[in-house]
Amino acid sequence: MLVLGLETSCDETGVALYDSERGLLADALFSQIDLHRVFGGVVPELASRDHVKRMLPLIRQVLDEAGCVATEIDAIAYTAGPGLVGALLVGASCAQALAFAWDIPAIGVHHMEGHLLAPMLEENPPAFPFVALLVSGGHTQLVRVDGIGQYELLGESLDDAAGEAFDKTAKLIGLNYPGGPEIARLAEQGVAGRFVFPRPMTDRPGLEFSFSGLKTFALNTWQQCKNAGDDSEQTRCDLSLAFQQAVVETLTIKCKRALKQTGLKRLVIAGGVSANKALRASLEDMLGSIKGNVYYARPQFCTDNGAMIAYAGCQRLLAGQQQDLAISVQARWPMEQLPPL
């Protein structure tokens, strides 16, 4: 089955072609970072308009790269949520229009299920069951995964997601958008031990997260430095390192608890923050200490992309899941509501 995947949940237009027998054939992405950087964050209306501009050229591009023609496509998968409604509607409308014109099925895919399954595109995919850490700009969740659509939420953030905390903290200390990669870059030059951040909610049982306090702690620390006349680049580096260490250690502690609670030794990390090198190294060390394994996608498939949507949609289509031509998207969509395969 040859599936065209469309991703438009936020500020990246992703298109890919995935074949159930041959694997990923082509993948293309246009990032709107430069468009939104001047505003310090994503402007939904601008995001939607740019998706409209980019979608069809990217579809033509992946068809050319794969050496395919439209008549060879068996189905279309598109992101139906969660995400920005306007942006989602662009992808959904395009998918359903093409599906109608080509007389093929289209299926809406859950954005975070796409992220969760992205490591399946790698040479050494994880076997079920496993624990998944979904960590992005909008989500921080620990999920037990027994199969596609078989999800048990173990814990999640009670306020800011980890990626959101990265971006907001970066903005508070004067870094460019997107803030997560900027903090990671500066942290490499930071001096450890100068600042010590708390590890929120690690001193109590449970698998919930809270990152809003770290953002406030960073703001107060930065203001104290500025008031003392020390707002140097090195101070930003040291602050970035301390913040990153706090987030990474907090996530690692919670992941270890989740593995112990479930009795599992396989961990998948997915979502934009899973590309963070410090987080990967910390989780690899932790899994090594318990003789377990950690799995993640290559960096280009950690951020939003069409390949993960094409793959996830393909699995559901092969299992016989169907959908009518109604255009329906959801800004919020609990992953536990998805039907199991």
From Swiss-Prot:
Pfam families: TsaD. GO terms for cellular component: cytoplasm. GO terms for biological process: tRNA threonylcarbamoyladenosine modification. This is tRNA N6-adenosine threonylcarbamoyltransferase. It comes from the Bacteria. Its EC number is 2.3.1.234. InterPro entries: ATPase_NBD, Gcp-like_dom, KAE1/TsaD, TsaD. Its cofactor is Fe(2+). It is found in: Cytoplasm. CDD domains: ASKHA_NBD_TsaD_bac. The gene is tsaD. It catalyses: L-threonylcarbamoyladenylate + adenosine(37) in tRNA = N(6)-L-threonylcarbamoyladenosine(37) in tRNA + AMP + H(+). Substrate binds at residues 134-138, 167, 180, 276. Required for the formation of a threonylcarbamoyl group on adenosine at position 37 (t(6)A37) in tRNAs that read codons beginning with adenine. Is involved in the transfer of the threonylcarbamoyl moiety of threonylcarbamoyl-AMP (TC-AMP) to the N6 group of A37, together with TsaE and TsaB. TsaD likely plays a direct catalytic role in this reaction. SUPFAM superfamilies: Actin-like ATPase domain. The lineage of its organism: Bacteria, Pseudomonadati, Pseudomonadota, Gammaproteobacteria, Pseudomonadales. Keywords: Acyltransferase, Cytoplasm, Iron, Metal-binding, Transferase, tRNA processing. One of its GO terms (molecular function) is iron ion binding. Binds 1 Fe(2+) ion per subunit. Belongs to the KAE1 / TsaD family.
